[in-house]
Amino acid sequence: MDVRIKCNSEEPESPEQKILASSQRLLQFTNCRLVRDHRIIHDDLWVRDGRIVNPEPVFFDERTKAHCRIDCGGAIIAPGYIDLQINGGYGVDFSYDTETIEEGVATVARGLVKSGVTSFCPTLVTSPSDSYHTILPRIPAEVPKGAGILGIHAEGPFINPQKKGAHPEHCIQTIDKGLSTLKETYGSLERIKIITLAPEKVTDPEVIGQLVERGITVALGHSMASLSDGERAVQQGATLITHLFNAMLPFHHRDPGLVGLLASDAVPHGRTVYFGIISDGVHTHPAALRIAYRTHPQGLILVTDAISALGLEEGVHHIGQLPLQVKQGKAFIAGTETLCGSIAPMDECVRIFQKATDCSVVYAIEAATLHPAQCLKIEKQKGTLDFGSDADFVLLDDQLRVLSTWIAGVCVHRTVK
């Protein structure tokens, strides 16, 4: 699928320079299929000033023609992918690289666009308080030519040590002074968009609601919670489950735990419980993916939960506290067969999920676009190709491989054949 660009201007710069570097011109993407309104339609996409525009007033009111027409060669145009849980990548670990966090986040943001990700939440695992105080204020608000930063996902430290996973147990804390405990731990709540906590460890019934009032999405995870614990947290305002099936009680017919929230009748009317799920072909069995999809499709969100080895070549890499070995698309503790995290990029997760569940292409894409945007209540700006939304999108071939990635109407990545 070749993308061909034709511009009307007589300016000396080449058409490719125009289209790749400017968001101010009126752009018309033709010969494409749009993911819009839960289906794939044959239509043109119009972009100007970093947003998707309605062509009708442009034609009839402004009487303006497109400055550049981009022939997409029959490609699918989908909203840009949104990753709500990613611990690092390209040799960067958000939780440990405290001295170089600005450069590290920029490296990851620019790397993610290769896999179609246009927005993400840098995720910090359970850490000492002084690490939060150092890292949080230094994470950049934006990165030129990189995926947008929606805010930080603080995965811990208010979790259950019995389900700590790879989180350092000595850094786990309890919420003993209500909201003030969180403020003291993180230093500030301003940059935080998501907090993962264990609901059974929350003794103050007002904490979750207070976080939600501040625009923070409360996620449940790394937990031994019963279903009733989870239902109580949802009734208090929690709306997300962190990496479903991982670091929580397994489903049991007498008490299904947090997994039971997917079918709970105690969820307040009109509220959706969302859940992240890792479809990297390693962490979650295909049958588990199908169960989650068929039980609660409107809440399913694809996340990578990727670690620092994402995007690195095969071999041994010395990152953070342990040497890692990347082989056969998996990350191991070097010299062992112990898996140490996911390294599948988002576009691969979308393809794996679509194949495992046999869902529609549109649904697989929406699980990485619309659903995370809805979870964060930003669906008016991100996650769709609706008129007025941000012009963050990805061109895909029929196998859902990334051809190019666009942020605010500017091309930030093109796949080289």
Curated annotation (Swiss-Prot):
Binds 1 divalent metal cation per subunit. Keywords: Carbohydrate metabolism, Hydrolase, Metal-binding. Substrate binds at A166, H167, N246, A247, R254, D280, G281, V282, H283, L339, C340, G341. The keyword Oxidoreductase does not apply. Its cofactor is a divalent metal cation. The keyword Oxidoreductase does not apply. It catalyses: N-acetyl-D-glucosamine 6-phosphate + H2O = D-glucosamine 6-phosphate + acetate. GO terms for biological process: N-acetylglucosamine catabolic process; negative regulation of UDP-N-acetylglucosamine biosynthetic process. Its EC number is 3.5.1.25. A divalent metal cation binds at E155, H222, H243. Gene3D superfamilies: Metal-dependent hydrolases, Urease, subunit C, domain 1. GO terms for molecular function: metal ion binding; N-acetylglucosamine-6-phosphate deacetylase activity. It comes from the Eukaryota. The active site is at D305. PANTHER family: N-ACETYLGLUCOSAMINE-6-PHOSPHATE DEACETYLASE (PTHR11113:SF14). Belongs to the metallo-dependent hydrolases superfamily. NagA family. This is N-acetylglucosamine-6-phosphate deacetylase. The lineage of its organism: Eukaryota, Metazoa, Ecdysozoa, Arthropoda, Hexapoda.
